[in-house]
Every structure is written in structure tokens, then in C-alpha cells.
Amino acid sequence: MMMEQECVDDSIRPRTLDDFIGQEDLRANLRVYLQAARGRGQAMDHTLFYGNPGLGKTTLAQIMASEMGVNMVCTSGPVLERSGDLAAILTNLGKGDLLFVDEIHRMPVAVEEVLYPAMEDFKLDLVIGQGPGARTVKIDLEPFTLVGATTRIGLLSSPLRDRFGIISRLEFYTPAELACIVKRTAGIMGVSLTEDGAVEIGRRSRGTPRIANRLLRRVRDFASVQNSAAVTAALASDALARMDVDELGLDQMDRKLLSVLIEHFAGGPVGVKTLAVACSEEVRTIEDIYEPYLIQCGFLKRTPRGRMATAKAYRHMNLLA
């Protein structure tokens, strides 16, 4: 079952920029950068993608490698615990290869410093030996492209961030774009889906393709059990309501956060640490997963004194301000 799921996940990923839906400005610019690099016969400039989880950072890196006709090596910041881990990867890269580092903001400082000469000069500085007898050896690397992905660009050090030639932000997707993504995924998965069914799932997907595809799978389960010929708006609405996903895509935790903020703290302001304790949730989870969409919807405000619920949040929760 796990292997089947992984195959489905891989098959629904766009392979080219033409297949990729949304992020129009980013795609247009990336197309230019790719074409220019191919024309010069050089590796692409190092690229940093940042934005909320599930918006397509990994997919874009895979598309870059495919369009350039090079291999892609994947790793993540937390995995690179020692400088030797990164050095081993860098020395094995072929000419023009793409190294993708997810959660690059979580790389240890010692590992990060190994990247500086590698990114600028395609050289690796290694220290051989210890104490007075230690010496530095320079190793030439093949030209490569580093693609970093992060949900928290503010946690990247300036020296690392400034070494990226291309820095692009991924935005939340519109409901119309998500409906197109849902229709594309449904076609690949062999799910019969009506136009209004796609729209219903798209508008409840929190502006995020990963969530849209996940909701489609769960709605498909309901359609299968109910022996429905197609996923309609009515079926999708009923299934998502049973999953505690409301008409704007807010789930149980979103509503709990707003409810606690309004009922326990009179709408705020309240510090995020206090709010996290009251919601029995991690601070980072609130900041990375829940807050961005609530702010995007206009339900939550960040102020110097803490988080505040907006009048729109009171109305959505059917509570009096």
C-alpha cells in the first residue's frame, strides 16, 4: 500500500513547466533562466525557493533538473549533521547536476560554511589533520546548481542567502488554480470528477496543492463507498463536512485556535507561546501551518503585542465581538 501511494504521489507531479499550474510570474521567469543557462551550456544559478509547505518547491526543483537534462540529488538540512556529510555529496556530483536541499534553514552552521566556497568557486576546502599539523586542501568540484527550499527564509543567514543568484517566493494558489490541479490529478488517478466537484474541493484546499490532492483522495474514498459514479459538488461538500473541513478550508485545529483566541483571551492580543499552550500545540506548528492561512483569510493579525482575532473571525465563528 505504501509503495502504491508513493507511485501515485510521483505520477501526479508535473514533469515540465507547461504542466505546472499556477505561480505564473515565477514560472515565466524560471523559463527564461532555464533557456539562458541551456543556451550558454552552463549550470543554472543557485536557486532558493521559499513559501509555505505544499506549494511546489520540490516539484519545481525536479522540473529544473528535467528541463536541464541533469541528475538531481535530494537531501535536507536536518540530515546534514556534519560537514563531511555534505562534502561527500558535493564530490559525487556530476557536471551540471542539481543538489536539492529541503529545509535548508535547518542546516548546522558548520555545514553551511562548507557551502560558501562550493557555491562561489566550485571548490571544497577540507581540513586534514588536527592541531599544529593541520592543513587545508582545496578540491575542485564540477559546476553544479544548488536549489534550496525553505518555509522560513528569515532563519537563513545573510551569507548563505546572498549566495543564491535566484530567489523566488511561492504564493498561495487561487481556488480556480486549485480546481485545475484537482481535475488534472483526478484524470491521472482515474477519478470521475464533475466541474463543480473540482471547484468545491479547490476552494476548501487552503490555497495549497498538496492539501487539494489529499482532499481529493479522501473524497474519492467516500464516492467509492457510496458507489457514486462521479465526485459532484454535493458529494464533495458532504464528505469534507464529515472530515471537519469547512467551506473556507478551515479544519478543526484552525477553528480551535480562533475559538481559544476569542473566548479565552477576548480576541487578543496574546503571545504565540501562550496561545500554543492553550491549544496544546507546538509554537512552530502554529506559526508554519495554521497562522499563514488564517492571516491570508483575514481572520488573524500579528501585532507587536501578540496575535489578535479580526471582526471577520468573530463572524465566521458565529461569536459576538
Swiss-Prot record:
Give residues annotated as binding ATP.
I12, R13, G54, K57, T58, T59, E120, D121, F122, R163, Y173, R210
Q: Where in the cell is it found?
A: Cytoplasm
Enzyme Commission designation: 3.6.4.-
InterPro entries attached to this UniProt entry? AAA+_ATPase (IPR003593), AAA_lid_4 (IPR041445), DNA_helicase_Holl-junc_RuvB (IPR004605), P-loop_NTPase (IPR027417), RuvB-like_N (IPR008824), RuvB_C (IPR008823), WH-like_DNA-bd_sf (IPR036388), WH_DNA-bd_sf (IPR036390)
Q: Offer a single GO CC term for the protein.
A: Holliday junction resolvase complex
In the record, biological process GO terms are: DNA recombination; DNA repair
Small ATPAse domain (RuvB-S): annotated span: 174-244
Kindly indicate whether the keyword Kinase belongs to this entry. Answer: no
- Principal location: cytoplasm
Large ATPase domain (RuvB-L): annotated segments: 1-173
Decide whether keyword DNA-binding is in the record: yes
What are the UniProt keywords, alphabetically? Answer: ATP-binding, Cytoplasm, DNA damage, DNA recombination, DNA repair, DNA-binding, Hydrolase, Nucleotide-binding
**Region labeled Head domain (RuvB-H) — which residues?**
247-321
Q: What class of enzyme is it?
A: hydrolase
In terms of Gene3D superfamilies, this protein maps to: 1.10.8.60, P-loop containing nucleotide triphosphate hydrolases (3.40.50.300), Winged helix-like DNA-binding domain superfamily/Winged helix DNA-binding domain (1.10.10.10)
MF-aspect GO terms:
ATP binding; ATP hydrolysis activity; four-way junction DNA binding; four-way junction helicase activity
Q: Which reaction does it catalyse?
A: ATP + H2O = ADP + phosphate + H(+)
Task: Summarize where DNA binds, as residue positions.
Answer: R302, R307
Domain description: Has 3 domains, the large (RuvB-L) and small ATPase (RuvB-S) domains and the C-terminal head (RuvB-H) domain. The head domain binds DNA, while the ATPase domains jointly bind ATP, ADP or are empty depending on the state of the subunit in the translocation cycle. During a single DNA translocation step the structure of each domain remains the same, but their relative positions change.
Physiological role: The RuvA-RuvB-RuvC complex processes Holliday junction (HJ) DNA during genetic recombination and DNA repair, while the RuvA-RuvB complex plays an important role in the rescue of blocked DNA replication forks via replication fork reversal (RFR). RuvA specifically binds to HJ cruciform DNA, conferring on it an open structure. The RuvB hexamer acts as an ATP-dependent pump, pulling dsDNA into and through the RuvAB complex. RuvB forms 2 homohexamers on either side of HJ DNA bound by 1 or 2 RuvA tetramers; 4 subunits per hexamer contact DNA at a time.
Quaternary structure, per UniProt, is: Homohexamer. Forms an RuvA(8)-RuvB(12)-Holliday junction (HJ) complex. HJ DNA is sandwiched between 2 RuvA tetramers; dsDNA enters through RuvA and exits via RuvB. An RuvB hexamer assembles on each DNA strand where it exits the tetramer. Each RuvB hexamer is contacted by two RuvA subunits (via domain III) on 2 adjacent RuvB subunits; this complex drives branch migration. In the full resolvosome a probable DNA-RuvA(4)-RuvB(12)-RuvC(2) complex forms which resolves the HJ.
Q: Which family does it belong to?
A: Belongs to the RuvB family.
Q: What is this protein called?
A: Holliday junction branch migration complex subunit RuvB
Upper classification of the organism: Bacteria, Pseudomonadati, Thermodesulfobacteriota, Desulfovibrionia, Desulfovibrionales
